[in-house]
Amino acid sequence: NFAALEKHGKSAVETFIADAKKKGISVHIWMQVFYTGGKWISATNGDGSYKYSFFNSKIKEAKEYANLKGVAGVHLDYLRFPGTAYKHANGVEAINYFTKSLCNAIHKINSKLIVSAAVMPETDSNKYYYGQDIPTLSKYLDVVIPMIYKGNYAQGTSWIKSTTQKFIDMSNGAEIWTGLQSYYSDDDVSKLPASELKSDSKAGIDGGAKGIILFRFGLFNLFHFNTL
């Protein structure tokens, strides 16, 4: 992300991408959208108009990432409101517009780049609380990653499969990659046993996911993905 570029420079980041590629690893740049510097930023103004200036600055940032040599994609995080979308006129429409504009800008640079976004796992209420209109966003994004973090929702492994299936049913073109919590919960960051993490991953695959994302690095017990 921008911190890596600021700290190490473009050349070092591109070298990292090239080295990772030699090991069979594709690098996607993580990009925060409506949350930065510890603060949430609304996608709309008080009168319901879009924050075009902010949108343009974020699209410019995304284009810089898209131009990195060898990069595989750009991942959008915090593409949402913090549970308050219903209080903002045109909030859903603003996020749809921003996402469409950003995806078009990135794909214009390189149509093969994967634009993904993390979304909340609450399916029916995503739009109302977070402004995440999955059927519409999935028309523009290449990949939608629902954060199906069972520990945070006091759910079991079966919830991972059923929620993945719901997102697949809602998607209008984007692949669904299941996002998993590799630790017990935000209140207990102890690592899940590798066997449990494997079972959770299998639940996502059984639900139809085309990929599995583990959150987060440094907080998971490894297992061999080829055994899924």
How would you describe each model-predicted region?
Residues N1-K10:
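Aromatic-lined carbohydrate-binding/catalytic grooves of carbohydrate-active enzymes
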Residues S11-T15, P121-T136, T157-D169, L197-D200:
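Alpha-helical scaffolding within the catalytic cores
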Residues V13-K21, S26-K69, K198:
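Active-site-adjacent "subsite" loops/lids of carbohydrate-active enzymes
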Residues K21-V27, G70-A72, S111-L113, D142, ...:
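Short, well-ordered coil/turn segments that N-cap beta-strands
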Residues S26-Y35, H75-L79, A94-G131, A174-S185:
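Aromatic-lined carbohydrate-recognition surfaces of secreted/lumenal glycan-active proteins
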Residues F54-N90, K210-I213:
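Active-site groove signature of glycoside hydrolases
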Residues V115-Y153, D187-V189:
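Substrate-binding cleft/loops of secretory-pathway carbohydrate-active enzymes
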Residues L141-D142, P146-T157, T163-F167, N172-L228:
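Substrate-binding cleft of secreted/luminal carbohydrate-active enzymes
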